[in-house]
Amino acid sequence: MNSRVFNFGAGPAMLPEEILKEAQEEFLNWRNTGMSILEIGHRTPEIINLLSTAEQSLRELLNIPKNYHVLFLGGAARAQFAMIPMNLLQPGDEAAYFITGIWSKMAYHEANLLKQAYYLSNEEKEGFVSIPDYQKWELKSNTPYVYYTPNETINGVRFPYVPKTGGVPLVADMTSCLLSEPININQYGLIFAGAQKNIANAGLTIVIIHEDLLKNQPEPAIPTMLNYKNHAEHRSLYATPPVFNCYLASKMFEWIKTQGGIEGVFQRNCLKAAKLYQYLDSTDFYLTPVSKEARSIMNICFSLCYPDLEQKFLDMANKRGLKALKGHRFTGGLRASLYNAMPMAGVDALIEFMSEFAKENG
């Protein structure tokens, strides 16, 4: 198959074709340097300017105040599960966690290795299909931060509200939703996101952190590469940053502006998700496990009423150019991820195929 397909994978995910073409055109000779972006030193004026421009674009998109630092860090977002408690916990502290899916469960277990974490709500017994009522929890007096995952990529669960913490810093794993919907940065102490969903290719993690959270040095001392303060003081150049990822992210930030900004892509994301959910709700052939009030608009999980047909479904979808619809290995089933770069045409093609498959196999 020579033409582009629709990639419904949870990440790495689709990128806009125009961005890929731009990167292709610039690959051998970036900005008339005679070098590829992959070859240029990270402390050169060109790359320092690239990082500065990327940061400014992100600040404009999200209206990030000056009292927040923006960090471009190398590596997986999962590393933040350890970095957050290591940086933000002091002796005697206990961090509070909402466990609403696989990723927040992993984050809690990582923090609990320090024996300084407790959970406000654990939805695992119910199958991670809903979000807790926010009247049910009570924070301990020694809580330095509250952690939650607004959108659970694996389980397809989304918080319909921002938890109220009474002034305690709120930490959010926005790996699968940052830049997909409007947010008020001032409601958060720290936000982080892996880039491979809505931002760039895998290997970059963006951290947005309030300056107040950098005032206290971690106790006991932690490795310098894991210290947010070091990265903030060096403007993401404490070590070699993932330059190519930042380059693609910078292009993505500008692309989002051409799409009407965050509000524009959010409106389209809502329409895409609503269209697919409407079809799923109209048929008994497909099952949707997540309660309606907690449904993700990024990661739509579903299954077949006849599970033994799942592989046939995937094989036929692949032949139609509908890729990566298999659910996560922890949950099984099927999943369609509708990130910013997924066009409505992809959703239409998926629904057309699903309808045909249901008629032929129902």
Curated annotation (Swiss-Prot):
Entry annotated with the keyword Magnesium: no
PROSITE patterns: AA_TRANSFER_CLASS_5 (PS00595)
Reactions listed under catalytic activity: O-phospho-L-serine + 2-oxoglutarate = 3-phosphooxypyruvate + L-glutamate; 4-(phosphooxy)-L-threonine + 2-oxoglutarate = (R)-3-hydroxy-2-oxo-4-phosphooxybutanoate + L-glutamate
InterPro entries recorded: Aminotrans_V_dom, Aminotrans_V_PyrdxlP_BS, Pser_aminoTfrase, PyrdxlP-dep_Trfase, PyrdxlP-dep_Trfase_major, PyrdxlP-dep_Trfase_small
Cofactor dependency: pyridoxal 5'-phosphate
Keyword entries, A-Z: Amino-acid biosynthesis, Aminotransferase, Cytoplasm, Pyridoxal phosphate, Pyridoxine biosynthesis, Serine biosynthesis, Transferase
EC number(s) on file: 2.6.1.52
Cellular localisation: Cytoplasm
Primary localisation category: cytoplasm
Gene Ontology biological-process entries: L-serine biosynthetic process; pyridoxine biosynthetic process
Residue stretches in coiled coil: none
GO MF annotation: an example: O-phospho-L-serine:2-oxoglutarate aminotransferase activity
Annotated binding of L-glutamate, by residue: R43
Binding annotation for pyridoxal 5'-phosphate: A77, R78, W103, T153, D173, Q196
GO cellular component, one term: cytoplasm
Pathway in which this enzyme or protein is active: Amino-acid biosynthesis; L-serine biosynthesis; L-serine from 3-phospho-D-glycerate: step 2/3; Cofactor biosynthesis; pyridoxine 5'-phosphate biosynthesis; pyridoxine 5'-phosphate from D-erythrose 4-phosphate: step 3/5
Cofactor info, note text: Binds 1 pyridoxal phosphate per subunit.
Residues recorded with modification N6-(pyridoxal phosphate)lysine: K197
Family statement: Belongs to the class-V pyridoxal-phosphate-dependent aminotransferase family. SerC subfamily.
Role this protein plays: Catalyzes the reversible conversion of 3-phosphohydroxypyruvate to phosphoserine and of 3-hydroxy-2-oxo-4-phosphonooxybutanoate to phosphohydroxythreonine.
Subunit structure: Homodimer.
Name used for this protein in its record: Phosphoserine aminotransferase
Native source organism of the sequence: Legionella pneumophila (strain Paris)
Native organism taxonomy: Bacteria, Pseudomonadati, Pseudomonadota, Gammaproteobacteria, Legionellales
